Amino acid sequence: MGLTNSSVGRSASQGGFEATNLPVIALAGNPNVGKSTVFNALTGLKQHTGNWAGKTIELCSGKCKKEPWQLVDLPGCYSLSPRSREEAVARDFLKERKPNAAAVVLDATCLERSLALALQIIEITEKVVICINLIDEARKCGIHIDAERLEMRLGVPVVLCSARSGEGLCELLEAVKRVMANPPENVYRIQYPKSVTEYLQNSGRMPFGCSNKSDKNEDGEQECGFKEHS
């Protein structure tokens, strides 16, 4: 099943997303987390949804119904290491376009798999909101998610959401507004031993998101974080 320009706005194959003076909000996430459902709910467009990996190959953009923003639905991917076309498209957009904020959609029924991508994006920009989608499915499975505790650990807003029913979407928009106006200052970034980062630097295989500049924390460990994003 393909995507059409009439159903999803403008695709990357036509020169990227449509140029606009509006703030740009990127929607990122693994395949099958309901990211396109979030996009549809916020824009009123009809991006095709499905339960197969790699469905969204190109960028799809649309104007938010309730806020003066341009939303960009990035291809579903599991990391920002460009091992696939989807990962390369998502990585390049976040790195080069520098959206005003990023909403990272996670699967409430499988947080551990979704969090890896979220942590990579937090290393690029602090203007991140974590949208834990499919919370209704998680409740059916008896899964409880402590959003407040997760927010404290990550240092960025965390919103519980069910895009199909509309639960949490207003809270998601409010959280995005907050991070654009006041970017979080104490976001969680993975810290690596100095020996690891020195080896990666010398081998030329620094993972995306890691700074080439040596930064140490109070314990003398190397900090990994992309420092160029303002």
Task: Annotate each PLM feature.
Residues 1-16, 119, 136, 155, ...:
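Conserved P-loop NTPase architecture
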Residues 2-82, 97, 101:
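Conserved G1/Walker A P-loop phosphate-binding module
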Residues 38-39, 57, 73, 90, ...:
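Residue-level signature of catalytic and energy-coupling elements of molecular machines
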Residues 53, 70, 82, 86-89, ...:
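Helical mechanochemical/support elements of P-loop NTPase systems and associated helical scaffolds
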Residues 54, 76-77, 108-112, 135-139, ...:
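Conserved nucleotide-binding/hydrolysis micro-motifs of P-loop NTPases
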Residues 65-66, 89-159:
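Conserved C-terminal guanine-recognition region of P-loop GTPase G domains, centered on the G4
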Residues 136-190:
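Canonical P-loop GTPase G-domain recognition
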Residues 155-157, 179-230:
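Extended helical scaffolds that flank P-loop GTPase cores
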